[in-house]
Amino acid sequence: MITFPNAKINLGLNITEKRPDGYHNLETVFYPIPLEDALEITILNDSKQKFVLHQSGLEISGEPETNLVVKAYLLLEQEFQLPPVDIYLYKHIPSGAGLGGGSADAAFMLKLLNEKFNLHLADEKLEEYAAILGADCAFFIKNKPTFAEGIGNIFSPVDLSLKGYQLVLVKPDVFVSTRDAFSQIKPHYPDHSLKEIIRRPVSEWKNCMFNDFEKSVFPQYPVIEEIKKELYSKGAIYAAMSGSGSSVFGLFSPEEKITKMDFEAAFCFQTELK
């Protein structure tokens, strides 16, 4: 049984306050995009092992036990006594890009196990399991445009469609430490909530919807800021960094037929949003 975990982008990201536990409260809008990994599981005949992880595509660092798809399997295996499995993960979503690739893999693994082994878990229960694995993992259970607050784990639906818009996503060969990005942030409450801004026409977003991480990341990694500027110079009506970076995306008008763009970057993805 195979599934295709997809990435997300952040539309706006406001860091509103630092919490007593050391984490930060924020508000952002998660929007799913059709940049996908591939994930497959089969029954493992060698019952001496709980799982075997087969990885291909983009390189992933760390031991198999640290991979979120494995953590997702072990979480349900412990409760439902699942059989041993072969896990095949093909990575197309870059890591460390602010695209939620690892979180998507984990959430889709939960959904895949639920379907394959007839666990009959409702979405709400799957979201509870996903939240154990990571703050934004639960978003990928329903996988629809969502307003997120708290530490990125309190969700409410957003009536938003970017169907027809052209998306250009660029990730330079740069790794941004999320911890370092947070350390430079001065939390503040914005004048207008993203819940209100997201209802405005996309053509107005440039001047009112921001990613607070850009203030700390751009001075350290000028190449990321240059990509954002280049997207605007090529005609994007809105461009921003996703999450804490290092990827940057641009939205182009449905009326504008754009050709394939080239960037001096490690990764570039271009598609029409459906």
From Swiss-Prot:
Record SUPFAM superfamilies: GHMP Kinase, C-terminal domain, Ribosomal protein S5 domain 2-like
Active-site residues, Swiss-Prot/TrEMBL: 8, 136
Matching Gene3D superfamilies: 3.30.230.10, GHMP kinase, C-terminal domain (3.30.70.890)
Signal peptide location: none
Pathway(s) served: Isoprenoid biosynthesis; isopentenyl diphosphate biosynthesis via DXP pathway; isopentenyl diphosphate from 1-deoxy-D-xylulose 5-phosphate: step 3/6
InterPro entries from the UniProt entry: GHMP_kinase_C_dom, GHMP_kinase_C_sf, GHMP_kinase_N_dom, IspE, Ribosomal_Su5_D2-typ_SF, Ribsml_uS5_D2-typ_fold_subgr
Binding residue positions for ATP: 94-104
Keywords per UniProt: ATP-binding, Isoprene biosynthesis, Kinase, Nucleotide-binding, Transferase
Gene Ontology molecular function, alphabetical: 4-(cytidine 5'-diphospho)-2-C-methyl-D-erythritol kinase activity; ATP binding
Class in the EC hierarchy, top level: transferase
UniProt-listed GO biological process terms: isopentenyl diphosphate biosynthetic process, methylerythritol 4-phosphate pathway; terpenoid biosynthetic process
EC annotation from Swiss-Prot or TrEMBL: 2.7.1.148
Catalytic function, reaction form: 4-CDP-2-C-methyl-D-erythritol + ATP = 4-CDP-2-C-methyl-D-erythritol 2-phosphate + ADP + H(+)
PANTHER family per UniProt: 4-DIPHOSPHOCYTIDYL-2-C-METHYL-D-ERYTHRITOL KINASE, CHLOROPLASTIC (PTHR43527:SF2)
Function comment: Catalyzes the phosphorylation of the position 2 hydroxy group of 4-diphosphocytidyl-2C-methyl-D-erythritol.
Family indicated by similarity: Belongs to the GHMP kinase family. IspE subfamily.
Name of the protein in question: 4-diphosphocytidyl-2-C-methyl-D-erythritol kinase
